[in-house]
Amino acid sequence: MEKIKFTSVDQYFETFEGKTLEKLIELRNYLKQLIPEAEECISYNMPAYKLNAVLVYFAGYKKHIGFYPTGDGIKQFESRLTDFKYSTGAIQFPLDKPFPFDLIKEIVNYRLAKTQIKNK
C-alpha cells in the first residue's frame, strides 16, 4: 500500500475516525484560536502551523496525539513533561486525557518568540 502524500489538513483528518479524530479537531481548533495569524499547512506529511518558520506539528495515532514543537520546544519545558511520554522532539498526549492547554500555550508562545528572534 502506497503512503498518502497529504496536501491539506482536512485531507489528513479524513484518514482518522473516533477519539483520534475528535482530539485532532480539538487541538486544531485550539491552535487556530491561539495563533490565528499562523498559516496552517502540511509539513513532513502532518499538520503544522507556521509563522516565519514552523512553530509546531501534530499527528494522530491509535492511542495518542503526537505534538512536535521541535527540539528546543521540548528542552525548555522538559521538567513539566513528566506526566507524558516524550522524546527529543515529540510529546505524546494520550487520547483518554484532556489536553494540557496551559502548557501547549506556553510552548507555542516560546516557539513564536524563538522564530521571531531567528528571523531578525
What are these language model-derived features?
Residues M1-K120:
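Charge-dense, helix-prone N-terminal extensions
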